[in-house]
Amino acid sequence: MTLILPKDYRPTLTVRDTEAAIVFIRETFQDKLASILGVQRMSAPMFVEQKTGLNDNLNGVERPVAFDMKAMPKEDTIEIVHSLAKWKRLALKKYGFGIHEGLYTNMNAIRRDEDLDNFHSIYVDQWDWEKIIRKEERNTDTLEITVNKIFRAIKETEKLVSARHPGSTYRLGDHVSFITTQELEDRWPDLSPDERENQIAKEEKVVFIMKIGDKLKRSGKPHDGRAPDYDDWQLNGDLVFWYEPLQSKIEISSMGIRVSEESLKEQLKKAHCEERAKLPFHQMILKGELPYSIGGGIGQSRLCMLLLGKAHIGEVQASIWPEDMVEKCEADNIELL
């Protein structure tokens, strides 16, 4: 847990003004996202049955919040979602979406094992979206075009927020640069993946870091962990901004083209979890029963934090924080909700 305390921090908005700005950002951005990406708002679950394999296993070590239900057998464990990465692809089929059609949801999750800092909370709120593509569109061009559309939605939201709250909006970069995790390792082999991200974000201001999950050539280790059963590790990435108030990068979106039957087999083998292939969701992919798709998540609280120049995500969402973090934040004029 690393807490960054910016020197001489003074919020420019009161708590009530901040809350009003949060509402405006959320409503504005989701309208922009729906229009620019061509996706439809859909209702989504907060929990799923463990046996379906629909929950996001993240890096494979995080424990989901799990419980049983009075109306179901005790052995049928229910889990609060970590994300809706797999559910969305299934929903595209279930609800009859066609080529280049898609959905977005308001996703709320609990990640009990999250390492807490200025950007990370156990409460996760994001716009989760998913869109059907053709198999031949599973390529880098499709990925980069989609990233630029999401960035356009963010920039258009920034402009409107700035007009509404002049002097209280953080100025973003004007374009997205693209780089792979291997290119980062080749350029800075002696730095950690996190340090490389900070370096490239500071240089470029806005960068999409591609190909996350597979082992890198020099270190033999992944740049970062990714579950093997939703993103194709060769066609995914993170949208990262340089955030001057904290002298740090901030990840706003993780997204990617989803696994095909071929890449699912390959990635399950690399991750040493081939037993997952027996789960219903995975069987549908392997049998070609689910549409090819691209999708991702966009952090709601993080976007609000970024656009409003806040020092801690707890200024734009209500969560629980360790007592020592609360005390340090109070001493630095950071008011956690």
Swiss-Prot record:
Source organism superkingdom: Bacteria
Record-level GO cellular component terms: cytosol
Cellular location(s): Cytoplasm
Enzyme class: ligase
Keyword Ligase assigned: yes
Annotated pathway: Amino-acid biosynthesis; L-asparagine biosynthesis; L-asparagine from L-aspartate (ammonia route): step 1/1
Keyword list, A-Z: Amino-acid biosynthesis, Asparagine biosynthesis, ATP-binding, Cytoplasm, Ligase, Nucleotide-binding
EC number: 6.3.1.1
Reaction catalysed by this enzyme: L-aspartate + NH4(+) + ATP = L-asparagine + AMP + diphosphate + H(+)
GO biological process: L-asparagine biosynthetic process
InterPro entries recorded: aa-tRNA-synth_II, aa-tRNA-synth_II/BPL/LPL, AsnA
Regions that span the bilayer: none
Keyword Ligase part of the UniProt annotation: yes
Molecular function via GO: aspartate-ammonia ligase activity; ATP binding; catalytic activity, acting on a protein; transferase activity
PROSITE patterns in alphabetical order: AA_TRNA_LIGASE_II
Cross-referenced PANTHER family: ASPARTATE--AMMONIA LIGASE
The family this protein is said to belong to: Belongs to the class-II aminoacyl-tRNA synthetase family. AsnA subfamily.
Protein name: Aspartate--ammonia ligase
Gene label: asnA
